[in-house]
Design a protein with these regions (language model features):
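Claisen-condensing/thiolase-fold acyl-transfer catalytic domains that form or cleave C-C bonds
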Residues: 1-121
Length: 121
C-alpha cells in the first residue's frame, strides 16, 4: 500500500472510522482489510476493536455514541488520534502507538478518504 502497511491488524495500533450508522463500522472492518468479507460482525463481536483489543477502533466513542454531525465528523477521529499520540487521551490512552488509520466517508458510502498517521523517527 502507499503507506507501507501490509498487515493492518498487526501494524496499526488503532483506527478511527466513520461509523455514521450501525452497519457502517462492520462494512468498513471488511473493506479496510481488518477481517475477511462477510466476517465483519464476527470480528466486531470478538472484542478485537474494543479498548484492550488488538485493534481498538473509535477510542473516542465513535459517531454513534459521541455525535454525528455528518461529513465533518471525521475531525473527531483526527482529534482523538492527536490526543493519543500526545498522551492526552486520559482513560482512553493506548500504550503503544506507531501507526493509526483514519477514515472518513460521505455521500452514503460513495466517497472515502483514508490516511495512516505515524510517529516521526
Amino acid at each position: 500500500t502507499q503507506a507501507g502497511i501490509e498487515d493492518p491488524r498487526k501494524e496499526l495500533a488503532m483506527a478511527e472510522v466513520h461509523d455514521c450508522f450501525t452497519p457502517t463500522e462492520m462494512i468498513l472492518m471488511e473493506d479496510l482489510g481488518f477481517c475477511e468479507k462477510g466476517n465483519g460482525g464476527e470480528f466486531l463481536a470478538s472484542g478485537a476493536t474494543r479498548p484492550g483489543g488488538n485493534l481498538p477502533v473509535n477510542t473516542h466513542g465513535g459517531m454513534l455514541s459521541h455525535c454525528h454531525p455528518g461529513n465533518p465528523g471525521a475531525i473527531f477521529g483526527l482529534t482523538e488520534a492527536i490526543r493519543q499520540y500526545r498522551g492526552e487521551a486520559k482513560e482512553r490512552q493506548l500504550a503503544h502507538l506507531e501507526h493509526t488509520l483514519l477514515h472518513a466517508q460521505g455521500g452514503i458510502m460513495s466517497s472515502h478518504a483514508t490516511v495512516v498517521l505515524g510517529r516521526a523517527n
